[in-house]
Every structure is written in C-alpha cells, then in structure tokens.
Amino acid sequence: MHRNPAILLFALVILAACSKNEAVVDDYDPARDYFTFSDTSAIVTEHLALDLNVDFEASELSGFALLSMRRVDPAVDEVVLDTRDLSIGSVAIIEDGNSAPAEYRFGDPDAVFGTPLHIVIPAGTGDRFDLMIVYATSPQSTALQWLPPELTAGGKHPMVFSQSQAVHARSWVPLQDTPAIRITYEATIRTPESLLAVMSANNDPLAPRTGEYHFVMPQPIPS
C-alpha cells in the first residue's frame, strides 16, 4: 500500500501541536489571576483607607493609602503590590499601634501590567498588620481622566474621574489589583472648595462643599 509522505508529515505536525497544547493546559491554574503581580494565596488585603488631595494644576492625586493586611502563609516575608507610574514617598508597617519604616523596592516594569512594589515584612511581624504608603500619581495615570473646564458641560470648573477596569486601579492606588479578593474601603478626598467629590460608597449627598469629603464602603467589593 502506497503512503503519501505529505499526509504522514501533516499528521505528525498535528500530534506535536496537540502535545504542546496539552502541556500549556496542564500548567494553567484557574485559581490564579495572571494579571496581577500580587500573590493572594499568600497574603490578602482586607481593608483600604485612602486620604488623597486632588491637584488639578499638576493633574495629580497625592496622599496615602493604608492597607490592612492578613498573612495567609506564615512563611511569606514580603508583600507585592501592583503599581503603575506611582511615586512612592515612604512605606511603613503598623502593628499594635506601633509604626516602623519598611524596606521596599520596585521590580522590573512591564508595559502592560505596570511595576511590582515589593515590601519586606520584618521578622517577628504578626499575621495581621497595616501598610502605610505615602505616594502620588502621575499625569500619565491610565485610570484618571483630567478634563479642563472647556471640556465639561458647565464650562466653568475642571473635572477628574477614574476608570479602573481592567488593570488600571494600580495607576492611582498601590494595591492588590485583582478581583480575586474583596475588600472594604473608606476615603477622605480633598478638592478645591468649589468642587464636589463623589465615590461609589456611602456618603452624605447634602454635605456642604467644604473641599473635604468622606466616604465609607462597608460591603466587601473586588479589590
């Protein structure tokens, strides 16, 4: 019986491709979020408190983020957070009311996912602690859209809004930027007195325009 070499070669190529695809599938972990630098199987954020100033002239948010962390793996010795184009002023670990500076460094940047922020957990730290991160965003933040007055409906005041999907929250808050965990949050936002800040959280809709606004989200939401 005559066998066509071309058909045989084609069959071998198909088998090789199938074998390669099986290897890829075997390595895939459906419980892992491949779009975050953080490892939520080792340590998780439970609460986020923001205190931020809005600077329209600089197109910048500045202040601090306070993250309440819970260590899942007792052996883990660092926290890895997602960032993109953030300037970090300082990092501190707070435990039982005591604050101490923390060692930190940026990892290698990625054009799509930003830059991991590695924070060392000192030996002797318990499984629950807070991270205080003083930081500022940049005008290049992919989550923040800054509009001059002429581009707003009223034409008198500037406006800024955030759009964090899909991986852009890390460009205005250093955090575990993943829906794999849920957190509660609160925020204090300071703006020019003529402007009003709003967030998807509990707040007073009749609050006077003082330039300082407070928000609370008691329901855990995707980080």
Language model: regions and residue ranges:
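Beta-strand-rich interaction surfaces with strong enrichment in secreted/lumenal proteins
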Residues: 51-53, 67, 106-108, 118-123, ...
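Bacterial N-terminal signal peptides that target proteins for export
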Residues: 1-7
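Surface-exposed beta-strand/loop patches in extracellular or lumenal glycoproteins
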Residues: 64-87, 173-177, 185-192
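A surface-exposed beta-strand-loop module
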Residues: 85-152
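Extended, low-hydrophobicity, Ser/Thr/Pro/Gly-biased non-transmembrane segments
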Residues: 134-223
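Bacterial N-terminal signal peptides
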Residues: 7-16
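N-terminal, polar/Ser/Thr-rich
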Residues: 18-62, 154-159, 179
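Intrinsic-disorder/low-complexity, polar/charged segments enriched in Ser/Thr/Lys/Arg/Asp/Glu/Gln
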Residues: 47-49, 60-66, 76-78, 116, ...
